[in-house]
A protein has these predicted regions:
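Acidic/His-rich segments in extracytoplasmic proteins that coordinate ligands and/or metal ions
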Residues: 113-179
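Redox- and metal-dependent alpha/beta enzyme cores, enriched for Fe-S-associated oxidoreductases
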Residues: 58, 68-70, 74-89, 94-97, ...
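An N-terminal, globular interaction/scaffold subdomain
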Residues: 54, 61-121, 141, 146
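A short, acidic, amphipathic alpha-helical segment used as a generic capping/interface helix at domain edges
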Residues: 115-116, 341-358, 375-376
Length: 447
């Protein structure tokens, strides 16, 4: 396996940057055209475009790169470093990292490594890479980058979530990562900078919660792919306060459009999406949902659960250490990544969703190579079976060879959910029309 810092052909990174840029610009142009009726959406398209241009441009000043999600972003901002997140989602980046990653690496890890490989960095010491170790693939990437001479700081996710020892280990690692960022950008962590960063993050996440409740009303107004782009842009913005204001404007525009339409809800099966995360510009899964007429009412994965994290720092006073501890504990309590042997937080979250949202089916998305979500699938299948909610396990990657096969299966799943809805409505009409005697006849037949 070749080292990342030693490409076999000098022009490869240039071709990779061009391919990545074209892939992103094509996807952005298409989605911007589809949502021209929402002027505020342009802001989030521009943020994503600026991020792409930065990642494909010349890197000169000290840069803090976060590979994936899972590290408290408010602490990194408070430390003075505006983090440049690489989330994944790029098929082109996967292709350019194929011969530099283990064969069993998942598409997200491949995409992250492809982005890191193409970066135009004159001195690798000017880049600090933070890597949350929530999967086996991320551990392998961290090892490869270390071997290649990059400046890497890892944050290990403890395998046990209900252990006080694990919590202390997590807080210690988060503190070390925050200090490493401050040292890298020659800044200081203060209680004032921490409070400011936490306040901005709380406002942004609270606004995102309201935004998501609005867009789930009517997907004809705002597509699943556009929703993913807006969610991802949280990680790409350099000014979180400005991002929050524009998200509020976009939410108002969407709501006004919904009110003008009159019909707030689509007559489509309402599903819960969980498992592996979906990142822009990977349009594969959202397009399948649209083709199969499935309405995603909730999406739960490690990248989206950050919007549920609202640290309470009022009791921390002016102590920077207490604020750091409060933030780290909040992230630890809400983490739904696959790092844990038993992810009780994820299980509890699913139970809460079923109590508050009408869910007719579940799409359990698994990217090939991400074995962690598969470990939890058996428990969820049994749980959803008891709740009488069908589960569709969909394993795929960033390639498009299996799209037609997946579309057929997805449409069959959608049709099955629709028929179940009609059957239940027919039974309810019979109960209303015939009264308790109809229920007694049904019970006697089942016996």
């Amino acid at each position: 396996m070749r080292k990342i810092s030693e490409p076999t052909e000098r022009l490869v990174p240039d071709r990779c940057r061009e391919a990545l840029y074209n892939e992103m610009m094509t996807a952005l142009g298409r989605i911007a055209e589809e949502h021209m009726h929402l002027p505020a959406f342009r802001f989030f398209v521009d943020i994503t475009r600026s991020w792409q241009e930065k990642m494909c441009g010349e890197m000169e000043k000290p840069l803090v790169v976060v590979a994936g999600t899972g590290i408290p972003d408010e602490l990194l901002r408070a430390a003075g470093g505006v983090p440049s997140y690489i989330l994944g989602g790029s098929r082109e980046a996967c292709m350019y990292s194929d011969d530099r990653v283990p064969r069993d690496a998942d598409p997200v890890s491949r995409s992250i490594l492809g982005y890191l490989y193409q970066m135009a960095v004159k001195d690798t010491s000017s880049v600090l890479i933070l890597i949350p170790l929530y999967s086996d693939s991320m551990r392998k990437i961290a090892y490869q980058l270390n071997l290649a001479g990059w400046n890497v700081v890892t944050v290990d996710m403890p395998p046990l979530q209900d252990s006080s020892t694990a919590l202390e280990k997590w807080k210690e690692q988060v503190l070390q990562a925050t200090v490493a960022v401050a040292d890298h950008v020659h800044s200081r962590i203060t209680a004032t900078s921490l409070k400011k960063a936490v306040r901005e993050a709380v406002k942004a996440r609270s606004e995102m919660q309201m935004f998501l409740r609005t867009v789930t009303c009517e997907e004809n107004v705002f597509s699943p792919m556009a929703r993913i782009l807006v969610q991802n842009s949280y990680y790409y913005t350099d000014d979180l306060a400005e991002w929050t204001r524009n998200l509020g404007r976009l939410r108002d525009e969407i709501w006004q459009t919904i009110c003008r339409k009159g019909d707030r809800y689509r007559d489509a099966p309402r599903i819960l999406l969980m498992g592996s995360p979906v990142f822009f510009p990977n349009e594969k899964l959202p397009s399948l949902f649209s083709d199969a007429h499935l309405h995603v009412v909730r999406n739960i994965d490690p990248s989206t659960e950050v919007f549920e994290m609202i640290p309470h720092i009022a009791k921390a006073g002016n102590s920077a250490e207490r604020i750091l501890t409060a933030v780290a504990e909040e992230w630890y309590r809400h983490d739904v990544s696959g790092a844990y042997i038993r992810n009780e937080t994820l299980r509890q979250k699913i139970m809460e969703i079923l109590e508050t949202d009408e869910v007719e089916g579940v799409v359990y998305h698994i990217l090939k190579g991400q074995i962690e979500p598969d470990f939890e699938l058996a428990w969820f299948e049994e749980f959803f079976e008891k709740a009488d909610i069908p589960v569709f396990r969909m394993e795929t990657d960033y390639q498009y060879q299996d799209v037609e096969q997946l579309r057929i299966r997805m449409e069959a799943f959608s049709e099955m959910l629709t028929q179940r809805r009609f059957s239940r409505r027919a039974m309810m009409r019979s109960i209303i029309r015939n009264g308790p005697t109809f229920v007694m006849r049904c019970q006697s037949r089942s016996d």
